């Protein structure tokens, strides 16, 4: 079990490329933290600095109050699972899982106990005598997880462990890793570019862009209260819709739209002196409904109707704006069809058009 403190962490390479910039985060014991962001945002580099595989250029890394900057990787009490399984093909599942413990010269009885315990948790007992070539991708990933589990480390680090699996296996392994966290009751830090993995697995999500932390929070918080337009657009699938316009009286207006703003949001916009200035309204696809209400109704034309089974994703054109609408599958929708959509303005978000920071 472990607490981590990352204080003003920096990573600067010899060519002066600044990959991680002033990273600050307190991680409590037993948390499941997910670093998420696009490729090149610095999430894997940060993980590797925690593991001791990358040198920290500036700042301090503390584990249970002890400064770890100069402590070698093998002495940090950390276990890591990589994107590639990195299994020894000539060894059995048992020997792959036991290899690290044998290198530490741990007693055979202890090794046997730990390997069998991990295999039981991961559903690998019947595969212990097989070699990796006889396993599926999901089973190989479980072996890689098992190899980390048997170390009984204080912190588990996972660097995009599911990216090599097909879609169905990823969903299955996502749930298995969440269950594993509950069983082990230990601190886990997980890196992914997949916001769905972040939303479904994390205690808290750390969203990064260009080496800078954009927001830290529980999944529901970052989804419902994004700190800026990047977070709002990155978290959620399909992404949040954005419309540029201005505030005129109690209306959000563009050249073709006029939508009434709820009083609570309008009061915040007034205190932030956002009236008559360029502003961006954001609204999620599920907060635009294909049925008319008393106000905030707009005519839209469907360009693409995607049926996912339980619902439709409607790609529509609304007064020159491209908007995605999430609709139930009770009705049929077709490309070229004209529909009336309703904006639930109680759920909309407003961002400063210049800074892209959330206003309300």
UniProtKB/Swiss-Prot annotation:
> What molecular function terms (GO) are annotated for this protein?
ABC-type transporter activity; ATP binding; ATP hydrolysis activity
Which keywords appear in this protein's UniProt record, sorted alphabetically?
ATP-binding, Nucleotide-binding, Transport
Q: Which Gene3D superfamilies match?
A: 2.40.50.100, Nucleic acid-binding proteins, P-loop containing nucleotide triphosphate hydrolases
- Tell me a GO cellular component: ATP-binding cassette (ABC) transporter complex, substrate-binding subunit-containing
- Binding of ATP, residues: 37-44
Residue ranges of every copy of the ABC transporter domain listed in the record: 4-235
Name the source's superkingdom. Answer: Bacteria
**Entry keyword annotation includes Oxidoreductase:** no
Among the record's GO biological process terms, what is one?
A: carbohydrate transport
Name the InterPro entries for this protein: AAA+_ATPase, ABC_transporter-like_ATP-bd, ABC_transporter-like_CS, ABC_transpr_MalK-like, ABC_transpr_MalK/UgpC-like, Mo/tungstate-bd_C_term_dom, NA-bd_OB-fold, OB_MalK-like
The protein depicted here goes by the name Uncharacterized ABC transporter ATP-binding protein YcjV
